[in-house]
Amino acid sequence: MQKLFFEKYKTSEVTNTRSVINTPSAFTRKNFFHIQEAGYLKSLKSHLSRRSELNSYLFFVVLSGSGKVTYREPLSEGGMISSTAHAGDCFFLDCSGEYTHISTDEDPWELLWIHFNGPEARAYYTYFRDHHNWHFRSAHFTELINAIESIIRYNEEPTDDTDLL
């Protein structure tokens, strides 16, 4: 992370964080993949985050630190599955299923994340999951980080064509 990027973030007792929320046009929501929210989080101490039944897909990368992600995948009839997360790991979740994540006390994590949706998002997720696990490592980790950072920057000061970027 660039120092300038990090310095913009809000600090609490639990996290340093920055996120952008995007409200795309009705046309964009109907026709394209679109960003709903993207951000950066640095845990200062361990805390649990739990979500379910969101109309969204979440992709996040672990920049540093470690934690645990637990997930009930909607495409599966199984129960909750857990995975330990370390720097360099990637996660891709269908947020209509329940998920939790918590960083460790000993090595709090730093994440970049993006929530997105669109008319073909389910098909994209299903295709991805047919070929990969929801927790994985990518040979293109640096490019993924750069892409998410760019999305955050583009959406911090939206213009008329931000939806299309």
Predicted regions: what they are:
Residues A123-L165:
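Amphipathic alpha-helical segments enriched in hydrophobic/aromatic residues interleaved with Lys/Arg
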Residues R29-F32, H115, S138-I145:
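Alpha-helix N-cap/helix-start motif at coil-to-helix transitions, marked by capping-box chemistry
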Residues K30-H132:
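N-terminal regulatory/effector-sensing and dimerization cores
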Residues E7-N16, A121-Y124, N146-S150:
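Short, charged, low-hydrophobicity "junction" segments
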Residues T11, T15-T17, I21-T28, S66, ...:
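Residue-identity detector for threonine
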